[in-house]
Each structure stands twice: as structure tokens, then as C-alpha cells.
Amino acid sequence: MLTTLNSPEGAVFYFEKGVYGYTCKNLDVPESATTLTFIDESHTYSGSGYLLKNVMKQFPNIKTIVINAGVQSIEIYNSMFPNIEKVISYSRNFKSGPMLISKETGILLNSFYHDKDFVIDMENIELVRSYAFEGCLSEHIKNIPEQIIAQGNSFAGSALEFGRKQFVNGVFLIGKTVVGVDRTADMAVIPDDATGVYIKNADDIEEVVFSNPDQLNKLKGTSFNTLVINNRLNLSVNDLLDYLSDIYAKAYRIAKNSDRFCTVDGVVYTKDKKVLIKYPNRRDGHYDVPEGTEYILYNAFAGSKIESVKFPESLFRIGTYAFSDCRQLTDIKFNHTIDDYSRFGDMGQFYGCRGLKELEIPSWIKVLSSMMFSCCNLKKVVLHEGLEIIGDTTFNDIAADTLTVPRTLKTVKANNFGRFIKELHVYDRAPEGILLSVLNAYNDTSTYNKIGLTFKLIVTEDDKDYTFYFPKTLPKEVISQLDECFRMFSPKAADIDWIDSLYALCFSNALVQDTAFELYDITKKDIYRNALKRSRQSIVKRYFNEGKEEKLVKFFQLGFFAKSSLEKFLKLAHENNMNALAAYILTEIEKKAPKNASKKLQL
């Protein structure tokens, strides 16, 4: 509910009622007003809040803001009131003065557009909000605290950001807190004793140098060109990777005197260059992992922009989630050394690489790890002879409708290949778990149109193909029986009568009927035709209710209805504006009419 209230100056505030009270999300101010009062409970609503950062309006004539006692929060950009000179607060939540400051929490919310002679008093300020200094022309600061927290872009668009006199070695310090960098400099050096570092974007600077690795914890989400760590780094590999995670760089450089780590072309390695620790995640293009590399650490490439990669023969291990969420990765050149990607308990090496459209697993790879290619965007997978085990959820959904598996494949663990596979080709015996993966055991009617109703299995034995059709969706215990049947026995021993009867085990009458219809269309077997004939009245009624004209035409082609029934359905077709169906029924009625009939039905 929207409620409007007026300030003493004639401004109109538009309040919305929420769970925690009333919030103003828009306002109009008369041009004649030079003062604006943020109203409170004396104007009905207690605990008023003002969330106005999404309001694209400007009120240049306002020079004074008055805050009444019950106002709880104010969120505005400096640009809304570009000529503010002072704030008068009767609220315990805000200070009076030239800037908007939260009294209890010490948060500087807005400095406003003060001129270059204005002195910014930072006494008791503990945190500076994002864009608090936008448009402020002053570079004069006093009472600077040793420690302060600056949210992202706190000084963006201000003289403090662009002025040069505040910068020392390319960084802008407030007390011992780095709150900005000189974007015109080639290098910014972060002081060792800086107690806080708040930089959101350093793209314009070629190098940002750190000597204290603990400061890197403050840089999650920050972008760099080259991040230089000028420290010997007596850290564990895991600690270093943790420091570098979620920092976006095009290259890293570690001090040459480090006994533990080094960088090769901007990539972080152990000193002996055997373990690849971190690839710069803003670097795109192709990467040849250097010969001599033995282990790619977990998460080493995670989230990077790499597009293709080639592995050396020296590499014997790729860690868990090493390339996870590399969404631009489209090509992988596997080496011949690794034949079991789960050997060390690793998994998910290429999880979420949605750029992968096609994948060919070479013949020397025997085992694929769990989730290795899960949540990718694969449309085609080629599995060569030699592959023996596919781990749990290795391929959780492939947007392909056919799949051929090699003779050597023995085990397919749960949740593989997914619902879209409609045709499977195996040799001699089906691998354990394959049918449990490709058939659907969930009664989810919204997916039937996507996954289809029937499934085709081709088993090649002694150069002869045996083809079986059964429902795509079945109870899990039935799928387990099918999986065991084709895993344990020759296709010649399959119980065809039992397989043909499985349609009746689908989850609903509608699914039973539609599956029988589709299976009859494929096989022309009497078991399906007889089932359709028994249910013909309910099928036609349902198809009319669902508006499925095309299916109705196809169903009437089975010839289950006499002339009298067809005449009733002709009327229904007209009533439902199903012209194609009406034309077909009329033709069938005419065929059934006596040859000497002189009168024909008219469409």
C-alpha cells in the first residue's frame, strides 16, 4: 500500500508499508524549498526509513536537511542534493554537521558536494559507505583515525580519488588504511603496516605490490593486472591458494627470494615448478601447462577465463575442482599419463565448464572421477574403447538423444547422462548402472515432453543387433531389474513379454496410455493396440480436454470407432475449432457411409 505524506516545506514523500514499518522510496520537492525535513512519528509513522538511492531526481535548491527524531535510516546519493551545506538532526541516529554521519555506528554516509576549501573531519569515523565522497571537491582531511573501513568505491568520483597530493607510492592512505590507488601510476606499493586495504578495482595500474600477504584477505573480489607479492612467503600451499582465491588478476609475480614458491609467465608454482598452484583467473586464451608439472592443485584454475588447455606427459594428477566454473573453456588436450582421474580421491575437475559442447574421452583413460564433467553444457560425448568406470554424476545431463558406450565400460555410477538420452547402444552386456542413469524414475509430468515417453536399447552381440523398446519413465525397482537383466544375460535371454508389459507400470493412467500409444506407433505390437482400444473413450476425452488436435487425428487413424461415434466426435471437433480433425473425421464418416447414400455430411 502506497501512502503520501507532506513535509513542512511542502515536499511529498511516498511511503510503502513493509514488514518492519514504513519506508519512503520516492519523493517530490517544490523548487522554492531550500530546506527539506525528513519526517517521523509526529507525522503518523514511527521508525521511518528513507531508501532513495534508486530515485533519479535532483534537488539543487536544498541547502539544509532536517532529520526528525523518529527517522531510523537515510540512504541517498550525494547527487540528489548537490548543494547541501548542513544537516540538522533531532534523531539519535544521526549527527548534526556538514556531512551525514551515523551517530551510534560512526558511519560516514554522505560527504556531499563540498568545495575544495572544505575540511573533512574524520573524528570518530569507523566506516565510510560506498560512494560517500562522490562529487566532493575537498582534499583536506583532519582527525584521521589509524584504522578505518572503506566500503567499495567509497571515494569514487571525488577529488580524493583523482587528486595527486594524497598518494604515496601510488596509494591513498587514511591513517593506516589504504582506501584508493593512483590510477595514473604504473605501480602501487601497499605499505607493510597498512591495517586495512580497500581496493575494488586496480585495472588501470600495471602492478600492485604487497609485502604483507595477510593484507590479501581484504581483497576478495578485487581486479588487478599484475599482483606482486614481494615476500618470501613461508606459507603452506593451501594458505597461499586461500589468499589468492577470489582475487581477479591477469598475472601474479612472487619475490625471487621465496624458498617455496615462484611464478612462471604469471602463474604460481611451487619453487621446484612441479605443482601448479594458481592460474590468474582474468587471463583468457590457451595455456600449455609446462612439461615438468606433476600436479595441478585443487581450484587452481577455478573460475578463470581460460579457453583451452593442454596437459604435459609429466602431469600425473589434477586436483578436485581444478578447472571448475571455467565457463569459456572449450577444448581439453588430455595427456597419456593419467588414466584414472579418481586415483587420489579427486573429483569435479571440470565441473561447471559450460563452454564445453563436445567431448571425446581418449582410449587410454580408464576411470572418470565423480562430477568430473557435471553441470557442463555437453551436447555430444564420444567414449572410446578402454574406458572402464564412470563415476557418480560425471555427466549429470547431456543434451543428446543418443549414446554409444564401449565394450570395455563395466560400471556407470549414479546420476549420469541424464534424462535426454532416448537411444542407447551397448555391446554384449550393458555396463552396471547404465539403465539406472538413462531411464527416469521420477513422476514429474513437467519433464515428459522434454525427455520423451519411450526408450530404445540396442544390444550388439556376435555382430547381431537386438533392439528393445520400453518406457522412458518407470519405478526405480523396475529400472533396477532391467539394468540387471541386460548386465547379466545375453539379449537373446531377455523376457520380451515382460518388457512389453512394462508400459502398464508407468506412474499415471495418462502416462500409461500415452506410452502405449507411442510404443504402438514404433512397434505395431498387438499388446499396445489392445490397450489403446480398451481405453479409447478416456483417451479421446482427455485429448479433447487438453486441446491435442494432432494426437486426436493420429488416434482416430487407428480405426477404433464406428460411424455413430465419429459423428459425435465431429460435433466436438467443430465446437473446439479443430478444423483439421473435423476434416479427417468427415472423410472417415463418408468412407463408412453406404455406397448408395445420396446425402453427404457437410463440413
Question: Where does each model-flagged region fall?
Answer:
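Short, amphipathic alpha-helical interaction segments positioned at domain boundaries
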Residues: A580, L586-K595
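Conserved ankyrin/ankyrin-like repeat signature
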Residues: K551, A580-L581
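Ankyrin repeat arrays, specifically the small/polar loop and inter-repeat linker segments at the C-terminal end
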Residues: F561-S565, K592-A597
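Structural signature of tandem-repeat unit edges
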Residues: M1-S73, M80-L127, E134-G152, G157-I174, ...
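Repeat-mediated protein-protein interaction surfaces in helical alpha-solenoids
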Residues: Q513-Y528, K551-L552
